[in-house]
């Protein structure tokens, strides 16, 4: 009754006879809509009316934030008792705010800027103060020690702002920097002044005879802040020193050991939403963030930064390529590490790692892939095209550090650019450049497609089309790699044939010239040819693994379709779309790619029909058994190939068969292949479960009770989800 009365109060009029039923008119207009048309009245802009200013709405109007008496009356010029415990509690909470901001993707106003001391310091910078605390309590712990802590955290915040301004990651998506109108970070003193202030505070604490845990905690906090201030060195000096990162880990672990023994409680009002109410705030009000209970976030930060610094030890383009491919692949790295990687790698002096120009770095990739010296083919190519290719390569490297969603989006943009570059190289008859570009394009197309499964972009009914398409791409890449391998073999054999020819020639000028040519080839070409050959062996094994896993997924989909559980069409009917439109939309990123050409919609349909078992009775069982046996064979081959690759990685690429280039990311690459092996075995088990379950239930006519879901195994690789049977649930129960 109460609901009825509320709804009744919303009525336009009490005289319902005056109202007109427009349902039939609405249905009629809807039936005339074209699926591909955007519904918009031509008299209005597309987004007109979607923006509004909300006043007197407590959820949107920050001026309505209610503060407690303690929060309103809090005074930074008061030394709250007990001083040591209070200062330790404030500094501790501030550092955990930093962790929440940087590790948990929280906003600046609900973390670092929620501290009244931070606000006070930043406000004082407006007035021209460039160092020291802006408060005066008469207590050295508050005025000096806490002041240096706040100064250090503000300096770190300034460094993060600098990183964000580089445009590597996306604000609000990777990192929030709502500075509440504070444009004063540039007024902060330099790094030396900040570190000196923190060091002096440490000396003050060392003079204390108190051996309490609060004092120990505060010392560790100061050391942690010093380490955080030193993060800037990796960008300003391109430092590869990790001593401060090791100290950060050590002190964070020490704090984690002390933390449970302390009850830290900052003075009431020291952290609040005060700044959101009183400063320039263009965002809806938010509650203070729930903070982490330890300093593990700093350990993650330090370890991830240490990881990206390893790229400086790369000895070849292959090693930098594999490093970029793996360092952010298994899990998303800390946002600071992800920003630092491209800035450390691609430097302001327009060099890569301070060693190569952009063009040199690009040519190094082409050389190591083709085993040909750049001077042999560079002269015929225009500088503009080389520069464009160099920029494209560097963009690929930068994309590797993006968050997991933007990573796929970056490939989407790059596909058409790789294709365009390939076409331009073909027009000037540069096979070597063209081949490497084709390899990068196909690899990116495969990565882009499979990443969609990791992000749960595809519905179960789309699994067949996507896996078959990746199988199709893998086949093209496999063929290309075999051709490249044959070219390398021919070059190696040509050098060996010189030696045989030398033995047959009589002494003389002709033999001397051939001997010089042979020695030059052995000294300058053979090593690179052998390395390239072994790298191509690795790439062939890797693409065969991808190809086989996709084929297994295709077979499992076909088995499920053979039992009538799934189709490559959406089971939900729609007036505004059809199967061809949905298919074309899914494959739109590949539609403009010239080579390999995107198969027509009918080809996808026909290939699925070829995989599906249409026979009945005993013939059905025979074909089903063949399919499951094929899956078992493919899984064994995949596991065998993975084991060979892992042995090569563990052996440091010294087995004379495979070169993987994973020296700098050995543990990460081994973990990746372990996940891939686990997925392979899970797919094998799943095929048996599918067949046994459906064969048993089809006799009882219960197969219609199942649906198919794409499930990621806990220890597996998400690019290849398991097509799992689930019992249908009545959604209305």
Curated annotation (Swiss-Prot):
UniProt protein name: N-alpha-acetyltransferase 35, NatC auxiliary subunit
Regions crossing the membrane: none
BP-aspect Gene Ontology terms: macroautophagy
Major location category of this protein: cytoplasm
Subcellular location(s) of the protein: Cytoplasm
Annotated function: Component of the NatC N-terminal acetyltransferase, which catalyzes acetylation of the N-terminus Met of L-A virus Gag protein. MAK10 has a role in the propagation of L-A and M viruses, perhaps in the viral assembly. It is apparently directly needed for optimum respiration.
Other information: Present with 1970 molecules/cell in log phase SD medium.
Induction context: Glucose-repressed.
Complexes and interactors: Component of the N-terminal acetyltransferase C (NatC) complex, which is composed of MAK3, MAK10 and MAK31.
Entry similarity comment: Belongs to the MAK10 family.
Keywords: Cytoplasm
Signal peptide: none
One of the record's GO cellular component terms: cytoplasm
């Amino acid at each position: 009754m109460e609901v009825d009365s509320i709804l009744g109060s919303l009525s336009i009029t009490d005289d319902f006879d005056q109202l007109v039923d427009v349902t039939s008119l609405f249905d009629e207009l809807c039936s005339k809509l074209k699926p591909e048309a955007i519904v918009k009245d031509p008299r209005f802009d597309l987004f007109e009316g979607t923006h509004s200013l909300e006043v007197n709405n407590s959820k949107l109007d920050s001026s309505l934030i209610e503060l407690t008496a303690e929060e309103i009356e809090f005074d930074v010029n008061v030394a709250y008792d007990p001083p040591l415990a209070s200062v330790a509690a404030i500094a501790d909470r501030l550092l955990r705010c930093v962790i929440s901001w940087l590790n948990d993707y929280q906003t600046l106003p609900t973390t670092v800027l929620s501290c009244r001391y931070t606000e006070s310091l930043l406000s004082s910078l407006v007035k021209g103060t460039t160092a020291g605390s802006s408060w005066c309590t008469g207590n050295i712990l508050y005025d000096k020690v806490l002041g240096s802590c706040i100064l250090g955290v503000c300096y770190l915040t300034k460094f993060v702002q600098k990183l964000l301004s580089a445009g590597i990651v996306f604000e609000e998506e990777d990192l929030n920097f709502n500075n509440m109108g504070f444009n004063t970070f540039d007024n902060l003193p330099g790094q030396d002044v900040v570190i000196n202030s923190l060091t002096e505070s440490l000396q003050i604490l060392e003079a204390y005879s108190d051996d309490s845990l609060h004092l120990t905690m505060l010392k560790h906090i100061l050391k942690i802040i010093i380490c955080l201030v030193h993060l800037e060195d990796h960008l300003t000096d391109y430092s590869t020193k990790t001593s401060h990162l090791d100290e950060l880990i050590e002190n964070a672990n020490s704090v984690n050991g002390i933390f449970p023994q302390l009850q830290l409680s900052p003075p009431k009002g020291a952290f609040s939403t005060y700044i959101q109410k009183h400063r320039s705030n263009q965002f809806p009000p938010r509650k203070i963030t729930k903070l982490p209970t330890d300093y593990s976030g700093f350990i993650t930060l330090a370890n991830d930064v240490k990881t990206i610094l390893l790229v400086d030890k790369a000895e070849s383009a292959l090693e930098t390529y594999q490093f970029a491919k793996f360092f952010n692949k298994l899990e998303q790295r800390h946002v600071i590490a992800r920003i630092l990687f491209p800035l450390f790698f691609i430097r302001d002096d327009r060099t890569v790692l301070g060693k190569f120009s952009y063009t040199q770095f690009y040519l190094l990739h082409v050389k190591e892939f083709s085993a040909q010296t750049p001077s042999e083919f560079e002269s015929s190519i225009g500088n503009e095209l080389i520069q464009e290719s160099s920029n494209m390569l560097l963009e690929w490297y930068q994309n590797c550090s993006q968050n997991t969603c933007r990573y796929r989006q970056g490939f989407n943009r790059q596909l058409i650019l790789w294709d365009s570059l390939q076409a331009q190289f073909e027009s000037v008859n540069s096979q070597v450049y063209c081949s490497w570009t084709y390899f990068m394009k196909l690899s990116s197309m495969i990565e882009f497609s499979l990443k969609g499964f990791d992000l749960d972009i595809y519905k179960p009914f789309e699994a067949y089309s996507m896996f078959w398409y990746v199988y199709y791409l893998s086949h093209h890449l496999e063929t290309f790699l075999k051709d490249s391998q044959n070219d390398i073999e021919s070059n190696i054999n040509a050098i060996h044939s010189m030696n045989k020819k030398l033995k047959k020639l009589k002494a003389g000028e002709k033999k001397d010239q051939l001997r010089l040519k042979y020695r030059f080839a052995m000294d300058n070409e053979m090593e690179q040819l052998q390395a390239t050959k072994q790298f191509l062996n690795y790439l062939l094994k890797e693409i065969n693994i991808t190809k086989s896993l996709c084929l297994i997924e295709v077979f499992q989909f076909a088995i499920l379709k053979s039992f009538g559980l799934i189709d490559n069409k959406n089971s939900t009917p729609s007036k505004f779309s059809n199967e061809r439109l949905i298919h074309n939309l899914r494959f739109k990123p590949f539609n403009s790619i010239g080579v390999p050409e995107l198969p027509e919609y009918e080809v996808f349909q026909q290939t699925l029909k070829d995989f599906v078992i249409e026979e009945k009775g005993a013939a059905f069982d025979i074909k089903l058994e063949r399919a499951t046996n094929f899956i078992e064979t493919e899984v064994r081959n995949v596991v065998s190939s993975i084991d060979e690759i892992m042995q090569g990685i563990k052996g440091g690429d010294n087995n004379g068969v495979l070169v993987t280039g994973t020296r700098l990311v050995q543990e990460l690459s081994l973990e990746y292949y372990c996940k891939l092996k686990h997925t392979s075995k899970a797919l094998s088990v799943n095929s048996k479960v599918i067949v046994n379950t459906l064969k048993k239930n089809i006799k009882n006519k219960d197969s219609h009770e199942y649906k198919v879901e794409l499930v990621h195994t806990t220890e597996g690789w998400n690019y290849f989800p398991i097509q799992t049977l689930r019992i249908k649930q009545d959604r209305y129960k």
